[in-house]
């Protein structure tokens, strides 16, 4: 009876992980996070005006804040730099000299 290696499931596992990642990426890219305005037939997420014989909708759209917005990559860079600076200062503050007690004992 010859010995056979166990089945290798790495390729199907990689395919499942890549497929799941792509599905999550597409889901996040196609998601609408704008506020809902209007009714079930007329949607004005970016602002605008709609008028017909029975209804009139006027919506100004989402407003920008007065705080200047930085791109997401800038926030990530700022966060990484802040963490590195915090680690650097924490290492400076806890700098201790370690000595081997057994090496520096005097035999008398």
Swiss-Prot record:
Pfam families in the cross-refs: Plant_vir_prot
Major location (coarse): host cell
Any one GO BP annotation for this protein: transport of virus in host, cell to cell
Lumenal side: 30-71
Membrane-spanning intervals of the chain: 9-29, 72-92
Cellular component annotations (GO), alphabetically ordered: host cell endoplasmic reticulum membrane; membrane
Cellular compartments annotated: Host endoplasmic reticulum membrane
Keywords annotated in UniProt: Host endoplasmic reticulum, Host membrane, Membrane, Transmembrane, Transmembrane helix, Transport, Viral movement protein
Topology, Cytoplasmic side: 1-8, 93-108
Family: Belongs to the Tymovirales TGBp2 protein family.
Other noteworthy facts: TGBp1, TGBp2 and TGBp3 seem to act together for cell-to-cell propagation. TGBp1 is the main movement protein that physically cross the plasmodesma with the viral genome. TGBp2 and TGBp3 would facilitate TGBp1 function.
Protein's job: Plays a role in viral cell-to-cell propagation, by facilitating genome transport to neighboring plant cells through plasmosdesmata,.
Name assigned to this protein: Movement protein TGB2
Species this protein is from: Lily virus X
